[in-house]
């Protein structure tokens, strides 16, 4: 029954030194985390500022697109009534296509 037991002195635990706690490392880590928190706060502020700028640009673009889309429709309705008297303006059509 006792054949599986090792004879002689027991080997020392290899992980003995690695398992010891170092309390000084925790004290050194605290300033790093506070600096990281400050960096994260600054990054969040920058992201919020950029997001607000993009929202404003999107609103302006939507407003601009609506005004452009309404103007050609109003201009096209009037010339359709007098289509026979006026030739087609290719330059104006090219400019409108470029705006799209």
Curated annotation (Swiss-Prot):
The modification Phosphoserine is found at residues 19, 69. The keyword Repressor does not apply. The modification N6-acetyllysine is found at residue 21. GO terms for cellular component: cytosol; nucleolus; nucleoplasm. Pfam families: DUF4665. It is found in: Nucleus, Nucleolus. The keyword Lipid biosynthesis does not apply. It comes from the Eukaryota. Keywords: Acetylation, Nucleus, Phosphoprotein. One of its GO terms (biological process) is ribosome biogenesis. Trans-acting factor in ribosome biogenesis required for efficient 40S and 60S subunit production. PANTHER family: RIBOSOMAL BIOGENESIS FACTOR. Associates with the pre-60S ribosomal particles. This is Ribosomal biogenesis factor.
């Amino acid at each position: 029954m006792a054949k599986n037991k090792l004879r002689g002195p027991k080997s020392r635990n290899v992980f003995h030194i690695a398992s010891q706690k170092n309390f000084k490392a925790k004290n050194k880590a605290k300033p790093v985390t506070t600096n990281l928190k400050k960096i994260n706060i600054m990054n969040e502020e920058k992201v919020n500022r950029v997001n607000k700028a993009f929202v404003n640009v999107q609103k302006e673009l939507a407003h601009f697109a609506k005004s452009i889309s309404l103007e050609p429709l109003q201009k096209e309705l009037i010339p359709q009534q007098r289509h026979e008297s006026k030739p087609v303006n290719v330059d104006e059509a090219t400019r409108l296509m470029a705006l799209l």
